Swiss-Prot record:
Composition bias, Basic and acidic residues: 1028-1046, 1680-1708, 1776-1791, 1998-2017
Name by which UniProt lists this protein: Homeotic protein female sterile
The gene coding this protein: fs(1)h
The NET domain, residue ranges: 942-1024
Molecular functions (GO terms): chromatin binding; DNA-binding transcription activator activity; histone binding; histone H4K5ac reader activity; P-TEFb complex binding; protein serine/threonine kinase activity; RNA polymerase II transcription regulatory region sequence-specific DNA binding
Length: 2038
């Protein structure tokens, strides 16, 4: 490097002599110049041509100010430059590198533009010269090689020598622009050592990059260039490269630095860079990580970032963007550094996927992510940065205009613009494509960078992908965006330059002396930035673009006085713009609008204060595009950021303006959409396929928008904006989240990604780091915003990582959102690692194939992130991307077109690094898909077509030339347009005098011309040109796309076929993808599905949520879902009735609901529910199914006033933020929206800040409730009684669980966060919440999915197409469709997949266990897939999939199983697996997030553990003995146990599989049942006969899941909670599954109860197993396997039974019901809980420890070992034995944080069962505390504890539970657990009493914690309590399966009928009161009570099912009637989706 690293270039200012300044031309001794090939080229070719140009004379000598009478010239122009000086310098070897020469040229031109007015002759001359210059530079050698000094002349010093060769390769600008920060980071392969030194000088400049690897990396490979670009450029020439840019203070030559700076960014875009980046990336992350200094570097880099205004900003990316470069930047940088350090530390050992390997990928990722952050931030951080991204390439060619035009150019910007802008613009188009993507991802999100950084995962992949992907990832622009691009080009044309020039470049406040500019203008924007974003495909819709353009004008009007010239110019330019914009094509808009428009209308409605809602709305619209199209969202997000950040008065003005504009846009779009609908529908099918690919994106979008919503108004915009903004920064979403969180799924996902993913990826390391980042971000961005966003985005992430989420959340909000987006992206990248990267990297492209898929989601997500807030998708995708799921999710995020391509990558996403790489690929693929989307779209050409276009022969060219000559004049414009769009070098050419040489055109351009000319001539002369006709081309393209899609998603086209499904089933993860589009396909297709789901989810949530403006729709949906619940009051009544507690009186409930809804504090609602334990609240919550109110008030224990207790502590703080966020969102979106948004926003917010995990959980729950209910209702409107209650309860339980889990599981996290919130529980709250949420989400997903498929075929279809999924059921389908499609198409699909998978999952749990071995292999794939899925969920479900992100992770896990599960899913279209895998879901969320993140290993371990636990649970359910064995095994060998368990599991799996096979048939029933809570098994046949009814029935039975479904769709957090509950239930159900099979309707409950008993489980399983029609080959396969598996399982069960019998008997004796449920699940639950707790704790702890804990608990699945400590200590992670676990638990207990696991240990001491649950529970509670005592309580209590765990009391053991109880009641759950869950105070008693106390309070107490308390449950809270008890029981069962989910679920279960049900099963009598109540509520096919459902004959069940179906039918009709109320948009979306699915 020394040779390539020039000394800093310092040119002291020269005083003018006689008006002339002659800069030095002789190189100083200390800085000799060099002679390089590039410099030779410059002097011999470039200078020669330019010097001879007839316009060069004014520039050939220094300006003589005296002679020209320019007295102020040297005051304005501080660094004069002229060609004469440059020429002399070239001749004297003054330059070190060509970059410096180019900088001088740019300085010269800029001086001209700055001093002279646009339009003046000299300016025109300069522009002409600059064009020539750039065109010449285009052909400059890419590699800068030092020549022998022989030619003394050629040498120029290139400051950036080190990376110079590469950077130079980037192009003149490229070399300078090599600074893609992420690339640099990733690229640091060789940078290891140099890094430090480079970092030293360049650290500040490069921000993170240089240090991390940019410096080294850059030199090391061209690839590193992208990384090196920023880093290298910075490092090499810190001052000029980054210095100027970064700190603008650094660097000797201000002008130069900017240029450098830009170029670095540019470089990333450059192809070279990309490629190199990859290579470099591989080593880079490692190198960075390897560097012990990595952390320091990161810190320094971050600090550097801080130091550098820009870098700092970048660090804060989002923040920066918003001009939030406050001290927070430093904080952020510090946090990032800390995170990096943490990551490094944590990750260090983990092992880097990246090259260095020294530092774990995680650490690297973390560092990278941070770096990416900072770097991205740097490049994107400031709005000014915009250009940097753009100039990915050196090809500055035609782009100079922007630069030229800006008289005021930021120091860094101007250069960038000039150099990069051009280059970027040009290059960007070409190479920047990939870069663009990366940048796109990172865009504002910085996601790409993040990805790149994160790519630590794929380190190289990410890096490479980021670079390459970026370069390659330009999607085709939609027609609307093409038109926008044309408008943009026009604005840059000479025609308008006279009044547009002030807007071409970022305002250089320093240079212009506008010191208050950034105080007033929080979100600077300029046309250069817009152009960069456009080139980088950061705009997913026209409104997004328009919003940015308008932002330029509003900023102008805001800052300048009205009479200022600039204002006049701005108005003039705006008139031009608005005129042009009004005429953009409908179709394109439709595309945008579609995506966008749909949501748009809603969006607007939602638009929280800022009208940013649109973005959200879009989401639904089409899902795919929506997210992409988040324009509105984007703009809104940006606006909101803007608004948020900008001063109020002006801000309000501009906000109003923007709002109106957006509304106008929205209306226009609606009109367009409607008018297009017809054509759109036609296209829909075509596009659907593509869109499916892209839909994922859409969904991401949706999520983004959701996220926005989640974010709340401001946060909303900000969040969405954050993720959404850069692409919706938050959506930044992704998850996504923003991303994932999404905000939203996107934002949350992103957040989740960020939080979880980053954390996850880095695992602990990242987690540690990320959280810091999160903190940073939070600080940077309003914490509130961040929180709200986080809540939205973080929810999913939050599950895993409060802090991380917070960061994400913070980032989500506003600028922070952007940063968050970036972070989220990063996180996603981290989680998805490459995911984000992939998204950003187009390079990964389809190559990524499957792997890419995951990443696609992530990547796309990332890109969406930037772009569509796909963050969810992106983040989610990214986060999901973290794993394959990420790919899926990512796919979803990428979802737009990307999804399809991206899908491909999914398989690749193997795991960990693979995932990263694959993800990145996927992302690339996704992006590519996007491109594909509009094959002939403008700039995207490069990405896809260029790769695929066939070179043209001479004859063809000649024919084409002749044909063009035949074209009429009016057709030639389009020809030029095509060429200019596709040929960067010609982009700036004047169309009227363009010269075209066919030999120089790219094949893709020629092919596009050919098809266009052919179409024109065909029409005209009907003669086909020689080339293929456009139709043929389109057909071929379509075929190829379909083929690719199939490859990628296995979803589209052929993939839609069930065959594909079968394949996928067989193919496991990959197969799963196809089979369950949700899974892999889900990745892409589902990603589209997901995105669609997201969007649909978003939509649904939006529309449902009233589309942001009315909750009713959502309510409707819920109601619809509920059917029975149709009437809130009635439900309330029912609820009330069921819940004996009078408190639940309908009025109260309603009030609560409405109140809650109104409060919009789902969290508060949840808290209330949770905290309140008042039946009323609970009832409301339950009711909320119908309504959304439920979610808000009841559950939001924290926020709700009622829940002040909980809220009191943490809530006020975090809760408040969340609450507000939630509330707003809630109002806006209603639970659904909330769920989406909230999950993202509130939950995350809640989680991180929260302390009231409960609240968050609640939110999730309530939303969950709504969602689930929806599903439930959909399925069985009339089944409300049991089912509904169950559902409500499930929701409640989920919420409670969420809260509890949050409290408990998250325990530690919440404690910190929400210590306040849940007293003892708070600690876990956040995490648990997230986890629970995730579980709930899973559940919800499952439920959603359940409703979706009635019919196996339908299911298959649904699997294949998310829309199909939504279509799965007619009645359900309608509402569901709307919900699903709008809200949660992807989610449902994913969930369907999950559930389908889960049905497999149950069987597959066994299978999973069998497959666990495979899965271990698969683990990576699965994880990847999970991640993919998660991402997808994140992206796809965006808001929904915040949770879903986690959920998806769970799903991903499931998807791991899912592959198997998918097979199962095939069974009924019900994805029982989802529930079955609830634990997995919950775990997956956390685990996935952080397992994903952390290590594939851990993930695998966790998965295994989860699987094991599930197995254990199943086994426990099947046989306590197994559990004991597992425990023993666990003891003996946690790790071995995993293997052993795997073996055992395999046996179990086989046994279970056999059972499952039996079950499967039943499970088909069960799947439905499982979906419904897995309580009611439905024969497939039944399902098939009356799909709706059956499904409804099942859903009823699976009420929880159904509740979740909507919530899934709506409240991610709630969904997560619901999912957790559902998953817990599912697990319970699974536990009972065999029995469940027998349980059809109400009897199913008792059957479940009996199933709970180990003996009955097995027997019932076998006995109940009826031969059901094989749903598909999967089932048949299962059937075959069943026998063997069952035998094996039986053997294993026998053994385990013996071992466990003692414990089981104790437990059984204790409370046969509870015992059996609990004990079976107890141990499993304990394990699950432990794992969940660990997971939550891990999440809380940032996943490192948590991951370990998870692993540990996973290892310890044996029921008792709760990994108590697992969460707390990662070390014990997998290896820790039970002792360790116990120690940990003790630690936890001691700490109270419990890591949630502590209880485990204690409990574990009790019987395995008892401790299992207890510990889990207690663990959750962190306090666990009671947990320990709980353990005394015995399995039941233990189990309860688990659920309670969050409560800390949970503690199962009554005692602790009590403790907790006080705190959150959750603990109550522990005991009766569940019951208490609700009750706050009672809790204690509850726990102790096992529920009675708990019962008593609405806490539902517990349901009596157990059966015993069943009566107690019945007592006041019966409704709630019993449900809770049932839930608890179920949860206990489920817990085993998914501890995390179970924990949450249990608490919730306790609170919900399910618990009672379960209890009832155990003690039918106890349950019966509940049952009767349930029956009251709904004659409950799944009625909990029915005494002996188990005994019910299949016929009875069938009858019940039929009745249920009938009810469902009625409900469906009712719902349909309601649906009428649902927005037409939704309907149209549904219709389109329907058609598409059809």
């Amino acid at each position: 490097m020394s040779s390539s690293e020039p000394p800093p270039r310092y040119e002291p200012p020269v005083e003018p002599v006689n008006g002339i300044v002659q800069p030095p031309v002789i190189p100083p001794a200390e800085r000799p110049g060099r002679n390089t090939n590039q410099l030779q080229y410059l002097i011999k070719t470039v200078m020669k041509v330019i010097w001879k140009h007839h316009f060069s004379w004014p520039f050939q000598q220094p300006v003589d100010a005296k002679k020209l009478n320019l007295p102020d010239y040297h005051k304005i122009i501080k660094q004069p430059m002229d060609m004469g000086t440059i020429k002399k310098r070239l001749e004297n070897n003054y330059y070190w590198s060509a970059k410096e020469t180019i900088q001088d040229f740019n300085t010269m031109f800029n001086n001209c533009y700055v001093y002279n007015k646009p339009g003046e002759d000299v300016v025109v001359m300069a522009q002409t010269l600059e064009k020539v210059f750039l065109q010449k530079i285009e052909s400059m050698p890419k590699e800068e090689l030092e020549l022998e000094p022989v030619t003394a002349k050629g040498g120029k010093k290139k400051q950036r020598a080190p990376a110079t060769p590469k950077s130079s390769s980037g192009g003149a600008g490229a070399s300078t622009g090599s600074g893609t920060s992420s690339a640099a980071v990733t690229s640091g392969p060789g940078s290891g050592s140099t890094k430090v030194s480079v970092a030293a000088s360049s650290a500040q400049q490069s921000g993170l990059q240089g240090a991390t690897g940019a410096g080294g990396g850059s030199s090391s490979t061209p690839g590193t260039q992208p990384g090196s670009g920023a880093g290298g450029a910075i490092a090499a020439r810190p001052v000029s490269a980054m210095g100027g840019t970064v700190s603008s203070t650094a660097g000797g030559a201000p002008s130069i630095p900017p240029i450098s700076t830009m170029p670095p960014h540019t470089v990333p875009g450059s192809t070279n860079t990309t490629t190199t980046a990859m290579a470099g990336g591989v080593g880079g992350p490692g190198a960075a990580g390897a560097n012990p200094n990595a952390a320091a570097l990161m810190a320094s880099l971050l600090n550097a970032g801080q130091t550098g205004a820009y870098p700092g900003a970048p660090g804060q990316t989002a923040v920066n963007s918003s001009s939030l470069l406050d001290g927070s930047t430093a904080a952020v940088a510090a946090a990032a550094a800390a995170a990096a350090a943490a990551a490094a530390a944590a990750g260090g050992a983990a092992g880097a996927a990246g090259g260095a390997g020294t530092i774990p990928a995680v650490a690297v990722n973390a560092a990278n992510a941070v770096q990416a952050y900072v770097n991205a931030g740097v490049s994107v951080g400031v709005d000014a940065v915009i250009p940097p991204q753009q100039p990915a390439k050196i090809k500055k060619g035609v782009k100079r205009k922007a630069d030229t035009t800006t008289p005021t150019a930021n120091a860094f910007e101007s250069p960038y613009t000039q150099m990069d802008s051009k280059s970027a613009k040009i290059a960007t188009r070409r190479e920047s494509n990939r870069q663009d993507l990366t940048f796109q991802g990172s865009g504002y999100n910085m996601s790409p960078l993040g990805v790149s950084g994160v790519p630590g995962l794929g380190g190289l992949v990410a890096g490479g992908v980021a670079g390459v992907a970026v370069a390659k990832n330009k999607e085709k622009l939609s027609d609307a965006l093409k038109s926008c691009n044309e408008i943009l080009k026009e604005l840059f044309s000479k025609k308008h330059s006279g009044y547009a020039w002030p807007f071409y470049k970022p305002v250089d406040a320093e240079m212009l002396g506008l010191h208050d500019y950034h105080d007033i203008i929080k979100k600077p924007m300029d046309l250069g930035t817009v152009k960069r974003k456009m080139d980088n495909r950061e705009y997913k819709s026209a409104p997004e673009f328009a919003a940015d353009v308008r932002l330029i004008f509003t900023n102008c009007y805001k800052y300048n006085p009205p009479d200022h010239d600039v204002v006049a110019m701005g108005r003039k330019l705006q008139d031009v713009f608005e005129m042009r914009y009004a005429n953009i094509p409908d179709e394109p808009v439709a595309n945008a609008a579609h995506h966008h428009g749909h949501g748009h209308g809603h969006g607007h409605g939602h638009g929280h204060g800022h009208g940013h809602g649109h973005g959200h709305g879009h989401g639904h619209g089409y899902g795919g595009s929506s997210s992409l199209k988040h324009d509105a969202s984007d703009s809104s997000s940006e606006d909101s950021s803007d608004t948020e950040n900008e001063s109020n008065s002006d801000e309000e003005r501009s906000a109003r303006l923007k709002m109106l504009e957006s509304k106008l846009l929205g209306l226009q779009e609606e009109i367009r959409k409607l008018s297009e609908e017809a054509s759109a529908k036609k296209k829909a099918k075509k596009k659907l396929k593509e869109k499916k690919k892209s839909i994922g994106g859409g969904s991401g979008s949706g999520s983004a928008s959701h996220h926005c919503h989640a974010t709340g108004g401001g946060a909303n915009a900000g969040g969405a904006g954050g993720p959404g903004s850069g692409g919706h920064g938050s959506v930044s979403v992704p998850g996504g989240v923003g991303s994932l969180g999404p905000g939203g799924a996107g934002g949350a996902n992103l957040n989740a990604l960020l939080g979880g993913s980053l954390v996850g990826h880095g695992g602990a390391a990242v987690a540690g780091g990320v959280p810091n980042v999160g903190a940073l971000h939070s600080q940077v961005h309003d914490v509130a915003m961040a929180f709200s966003q986080m809540a939205g985005g973080g929810a999913a992430a939050g599950a895993g990582f409060g802090a991380g989420v917070t960061a994400a959340g913070a980032s989500s909000g506003g600028k922070a959102g952007t940063l968050a987006g970036a972070l989220a992206a990063g996180a996603a990248a981290g989680a998805g690692g490459t995911t984000a990267g992939s998204g950003s990297s187009k390079g990964a492209k389809s190559k990524g194939g499957r792997g890419a898929k995951g990443s696609g989601a992530g990547g796309v997500g990332a890109s969406n992130n930037a772009a569509a807030g796909n963050a969810a998708g992106g983040a989610a995708g990214a986060a999901a991307g973290a794993g394959s799921v990420g790919g899926v999710g990512g796919a979803g995020a990428a979802g737009g077109g990307n999804a399809s391509k991206r899908a491909k990558g999914s398989s690749s996403a193997g795991a960990g690094g693979g995932v990263g790489g694959a993800n990145a690929s996927a992302g690339g693929a996704g992006a590519r898909g996007s491109s594909k989307k509009k094959p002939s779209q403008v700039m995207n050409f490069d990405s896809e077509e260029e790769d695929t276009a066939k070179p043209m022969s001479y004859d063809e060219k000649r024919q084409l030339s002749l044909d063009i000559n035949k074209l009429p004049g009016d057709k030639l414009g389009r020809v030029v347009h095509i060429i200019q769009n596709r040929e960067p070098s010609l982009r700036d050419s004047n169309p009227d005098e363009i010269e075209i040489d066919f030999e120089t055109l790219k094949p893709s351009t020629l092919r596009e011309l050919e098809s266009y000319v052919a179409s024109c001539l065909r029409k005209k002369t009907h003669k086909k040109p020689s080339g293929k006709s456009k139709d043929e081309q389109m057909a071929e393209k379509k075929q190829e796309l379909e083929k690719r899609l199939q490859d990628v998603t296995g979803q589209l086209g052929a993939s839609k076929k069930t065959a594909k499904k079968d394949e996928s089933a067989s193919s496991k993860v990959e197969a799963v993808q196809p089979a369950n589009p949700v899974s892999s396909s889900s990745s892409s297709s589902d990603s589209s599905s997901s995105s669609s789901s997201d969007s649909s989810s978003s939509d649904s949530s939006d529309s449902e949520a009233g589309d942001g403006d009315e909750r009713p729709p959502r309510k409707k949906k819920s109601r619809d879902s509920n059917g029975s619940n149709v009437n809130n009051p009635s439900i309330n009544v029912v609820m009330g009735g069921n819940l004996p507690s009078g408190a639940l009186s309908p009025t109260t409930m309603l009030m609560g609901l409405d109140h809650v809804v109104n409060s919009n504090t789902p969290t508060s609602q949840m808290s209330n529910m949770l905290g309140n334990a008042n039946p009323l609240t609970a009832a409301a919550m339950l009711n909320n199914n119908n309504k959304t109110s439920l979610p808000g008030s009841n559950f939001g224990g924290a926020p709700a006033p009622g829940n002040m207790m909980h809220a009191g502590a943490g809530v006020p703080v975090a809760g408040a933020a969340v609450s507000a966020s939630t509330g707003q969102q809630h109002n806006k979106n209603g639970p659904n929206d909330l769920s989406k948004v909230q999950p993202g926003g509130p939950i995350n917010a809640a989680l991180p800040p929260h302390s009231f995990a409960g609240g968050t959980a609640t939110v999730a729950t309530s939303q969950s409730s709504g969602g689930i209910r929806i599903a439930s209702n959909l399925h069985k409107p009339s089944g409300l009684g049991g089912g509904d209650l169950g559902e409500h309860h499930a929701a409640l339980a989920a919420a409670l669980t969420s809260g509890i889990n949050s409290t408990g599981t998250a325990g530690g996290g919440i404690n910190n966060n929400g210590g306040s919130n849940n007293n003892a529980n708070p600690l876990g709250g956040s995490h648990g919440d997230a986890m629970v949420n995730a579980s709930l989400a899973s559940l919800a997903s499952g439920l959603k999915q359940i409703p979706q498929f009635d019919d196996p075929v339908e299911q298959s279809l649904a699997s294949l197409e998310f829309s199909a999924g939504s279509t799965g059921k007619s009645g359900l389908t309608d509402n569901f469709l709307m919900q699903q499609h709008l809200m949660q198409p992807a989610g449902p699909q994913q969930q369907q997949q999950q559930q389908q998978q889960q049905p497999f999952g149950h069987q597959q749990q066994q299978q999973q266990q069998q497959q666990q071995q495979q899965q271990q292999q698969q683990h990576m794939d699965y994880v990847t897939e999970l991640l993919s899925k998660g991402a997808e969920n994140v992206g796809g479900m965006n808001g929904n999939h915040l949770l879903n992100f986690n959920l998806d992770m769970a799903a991903a896990y499931q998807q791991k199983h899912p592959q198997q599960q998918q097979q199962q899913a095939h069974n009924n279209g019900f994805n029982v697996a989802d529930f079955g895998m609830a634990g997995f879901d919950g775990l997956n969320m956390t685990a996935a997030s952080f397992l994903d993140l952390e290590p594939s290993l851990q993930q695998q371990q966790m998965q295994q553990m989860q699987l094991q636990q599930q197995h254990h649970q199943q086994q426990q359910q099947q046989t306590h003995q197994q559990q004991q064995q597992h425990q023993q095994q666990h003891h003996q060998q946690q790790q071995q146990q995993q293997l052993t368990q795997q073996q055992l599991q395999q046996q179990q799996q086989q046994q279970q599989q056999q059972q499952h096979l039996q079950q499967q048939q039943h499970q088909q029933q069960h799947h439905q049942a499982a979906n419904k809570l897995l309580i009611i098994p439905k024969p497939i046949e039944s399902m098939m006969p009356s799909p709706p009814d059956k499904q409804q029935l099942q859903q009823h039975q699976k009420v929880l899941p159904p509740q979740q479904s909507p919530s899934d769709m709506k409240l991610h957090p709630n969904a997560a909670a619901a999912a957790a509950v559902a998953s817990a239930q599912a697990k319970l159900v699974q536990t009972f599954k065999a029995n469940e099979q027998n349980l059809k309707n109400a009897s199913s409950w008792s059957s479940l109860a009996s199933a709970n008993s180990p003996q009955s489980h097995t027997s019932s399983s076998s006995s109940s197993s009826k031969a059901k029609p094989a749903m598909d080959s999967f089932q048949q396969f299962r059937n075959k396997a069943k026998e063997r598996d069952r035998l094996k399982l039986l053997e294993a069960a026998e053994k385990e039974k013996k071992n466990q019998k003692e414990a089981a008997e104790k437990e059984q004796q204790r409370k046969h019901h509870k015992s059996s449920s609990s004990s079976l699940t107890s141990a499993a639950v304990a394990q699950a809980a432990a794992i969940a707790a660990a997971t939550a704790a891990a999440a809380v702890t940032l996943g490192a420890a948590a991951a370990a804990a998870l692993a540990s608990s996973a290892s310890n699945p044996s029921g008792g070992s709760s990994s108590g400590g697992a969460g707390s200590t990662s070390q014990q992670a997998i290896t820790g034995d039970r002792d360790r676990d116990r120690d940990r638990e003790r630690e936890r207990e001691r700490s109270g944080s419990g890591g949630g696991q502590s209880g485990n240990g204690n409990n574990s001491s009790n019987s395995a069962n008892s401790n299992g649950p207890g510990s889990a529970g207690s663990g959750g509670s962190g306090g666990g505390g009671g947990s320990g005592p709980a353990s005394a309580g015995g399995p039941n209590s233990g189990g309860g504890g688990t659920a309670n765990s969050n409560s800390g009391g949970g503690g199962g053991g009554g005692g602790p539970a009590l403790l907790n109880a006080g705190s959150n009641s959750n603990s109550g759950v522990g005991s009766g657990g569940a019951a208490s869950s609700n009750s706050n105070s009672s809790v204690g008693g509850i726990v102790g009493s096992g529920g009675p106390g708990s019962n008593s309070q609405g806490s539902s107490g517990g349901g009596g914690g157990g059966p015993a308390s069943g009566g107690g449950m019945g007592s006041g809270a019966i409704d709630y309590g019993q449900q809770v008890a049932v839930l608890t029981q179920v949860a206990a069962n489920a817990q085993a399966q998914h501890v995390a989910a179970a924990v949450a679920a249990q608490a919730i279960l306790a609170a919900s009928p399910l618990g009672a049900m379960e209890s009832g099963r155990k003690s039918v009598h106890d349950a019966q009161p509940q049952i009767s109540r349930v029956e009251d509520i709904k004659a409950s096919p799944g009625g909990q009570g029915q005494s002996s459902p188990a005994q019910q004959s299949p016929q009875d069940r069938a009858a019940a099912k039929r009745a249920e179906q009938r009810r469902a039918e009625q409900e469906r009709r009712r719902r349909e009637a309601l649906a009428g109320q649902i927005d037409m948009n939704m309907q149209s979306d549904l219709m389109a989706a329907f058609e598409e699915t059809l």
